[in-house]
Amino acid sequence: SDKDDERCTVVILDSVTDPHNVGAILRSADQFGASLVILPERHSANKVNENDVIQRSSAGAASWVPVSVVTNLSRCVEKLKESGFWVYGADAGGVSVADDMFAKKTVLVMGSEGTGISRLLKQQCDSIVSIPTCGKIDSLNVSVATGVLLYEIYRQSVNCT
């Protein structure tokens, strides 16, 4: 059916505790058509509707982008995989997004800036992707990296339809 052909992008934020980053990610999620942002109950800036910083940094997107707070990210990823999603983890050592074609049903897992994606979640990923850069520090802010990856998923879907 047509519904099966539609692109669906889910963003999972693993231990992203800075509300500025969460807000900026919600803004990118809105701009590039992500269907849902999932945050863990613990170790996360997840009070989206009550946090003024998230509200301001999202430029209003926090009101539009569906957000789900879950107790267990690993179980959540398993359920998404069972529903036919392909899970991509973002990590500096991954395959360049320039060389990867994202699946129609995509989960994008973003880790904290300090520690990255937790070991267990990383093991659950079907692919690990990275953004090719040319800087000396080989590192992007998590909200910027999420925006770049969401744009690439969006760009591929526009080119494929």
What residues fall within each predicted segment?
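RNA substrate-binding interface of SAM-dependent RNA methyltransferases
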Residues: S1-V95
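Generic leucine side-chain signal with a strong bias for well-ordered alpha-helical environments
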Residues: L13, L73, L80, L108, ...
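Surface-exposed beta-strand edges and their flanking turn/coil or helix-capping segments
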Residues: L26, K81-S83, F102, S112, ...
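Structured adenosyl-cofactor binding patch, chiefly the S-adenosyl-L-methionine
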Residues: D30-Q31, Q55-A61, R119-T161
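Active-site/ligand-binding-proximal alpha/beta "capping" segment
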Residues: Y88-K136, N141
